[in-house]
Amino acid sequence: MNFVTTLTYLLPHRMLSSLARHVAYCQHPLIKQWLIDTVIAKFDVNLSEAAEPDAHAYPSFNAFFTRSLKAGIRPPDPNPDTLLMPADGRISQLGPIREGRIFQAKGQSFTATELLGDTAAASAFTNGLFATVYLSPRDYHRVHMPCTGQLLKTVHVPGRLFSVGPDAVRQIPRLFARNERLVCHFDTTFGPMVLVMVGALLVSGVETVWGGVEIPAYGDRITYKDYQGRNIAIERFAEMARFNYGSTVIVLLPPNVLTLAPHLTAESPVTLGQALAHRLSLNHSTQAPTQEK
C-alpha cells in the first residue's frame, strides 16, 4: 500500500466531505469560477457536450458539476432487449457474481451481501452479473436507468468515504462494501435489478429523482425505505440520480437472463446509453468477460 492510500485511512473523511459540500454550493463569483476553471483544466472537461457550454454561466461549482447534456448527444441503444449503460465513465470491473462474490481488483473482492446490506436481497443475484462504472471528475455526473423499472426500496448503508479512484480500488480491501452507499432496488422486465450509488471522499451528496438528497444521511444505522405501492416507475434512459462529485455506480443483474456486451472489459471507457448487456434470447455469446485473479 503506497503512502497516498495509507493517508486516506487517516484523513477526516466526514469533515472534508462536509467542507466540500459547502464549497460546492458557494456562489461567490471568484471562488466558484476558480474551482470550475481548475477542474476544466486539470481533467480536460468537454463543455461542448453540455446544455450550457459557457463555464461562466453556472451559479455554483455544484451546478457546473451536475450539468445536463445537450439533447440527443447520448442516443440510447434502440433495441428494447438491450440493457443500457447507466453513466459516462470507465468500467472498473464487470463479470459474473461467483459464489456470491463481486470482483474488485486483483486479489480483492467482496460479497453481494456486504454490498447490499441484506442477505435475502443478495441471494437474488447469486450467479448473476455485475458492472462497476467509475465516474471521474471530468464525466457527466447524472445516472440514468438501464431499463424501465419500478422502484421497490432503497437502503442507505453508512460507512467510510474512501477515494474510489483506481489506486484506491486496487489497494483498499472491500472498498465498495465499506464506503457509504445508497442501494436502489428495482423490478424490471429483466427481473430484479439493483443500482448502487457509492459515496466517496469529497462527494458532497447523492440525489435521487424521487427523494432528493439521500447522502449525506447522518447516522450509523442502515436505513430502509419501502416504496412498494407508491407506483414510482422510471423509464428506460430517464435520469434516476446524480452525484455531486465523482464516484461509482454498481449494477447488479439476475442470473440466466442477460449476457454482458462482449466488447466491454475492465478499463473500457463507456458512454451513457450504449449497450451494457443483452437479453440471452438474442443469441449473444454467454461468455463473461475475463477477470484478473
Swiss-Prot record:
Belongs to the phosphatidylserine decarboxylase family. PSD-B subfamily. Prokaryotic type I sub-subfamily. It catalyses: a 1,2-diacyl-sn-glycero-3-phospho-L-serine + H(+) = a 1,2-diacyl-sn-glycero-3-phosphoethanolamine + CO2. Catalyzes the formation of phosphatidylethanolamine (PtdEtn) from phosphatidylserine (PtdSer). It is found in: Cell membrane. Binds 1 pyruvoyl group covalently per subunit. Keywords: Cell membrane, Decarboxylase, Lipid biosynthesis, Lipid metabolism, Lyase, Membrane, Phospholipid biosynthesis, Phospholipid metabolism, Pyruvate, Zymogen. Its main location: membrane. This is Phosphatidylserine decarboxylase proenzyme. Its cofactor is pyruvate. One of its GO terms (molecular function) is phosphatidylserine decarboxylase activity. The keyword Membrane applies. The modification Pyruvic acid (Ser) is found at residue 247. Transmembrane segments: none annotated. Is synthesized initially as an inactive proenzyme. Formation of the active enzyme involves a self-maturation process in which the active site pyruvoyl group is generated from an internal serine residue via an autocatalytic post-translational modification. Two non-identical subunits are generated from the proenzyme in this reaction, and the pyruvate is formed at the N-terminus of the alpha chain, which is derived from the carboxyl end of the proenzyme. GO terms for biological process: phosphatidylethanolamine biosynthetic process. Heterodimer of a large membrane-associated beta subunit and a small pyruvoyl-containing alpha subunit. NCBIfam families: PS_decarb. It comes from Xylella fastidiosa (strain Temecula1 / ATCC 700964). The record marks 246-247 as: Cleavage (non-hydrolytic). Pathway: Phospholipid metabolism; phosphatidylethanolamine biosynthesis; phosphatidylethanolamine from CDP-diacylglycerol: step 2/2. The active site is at residues 88, 144, 247. Its EC number is 4.1.1.65.
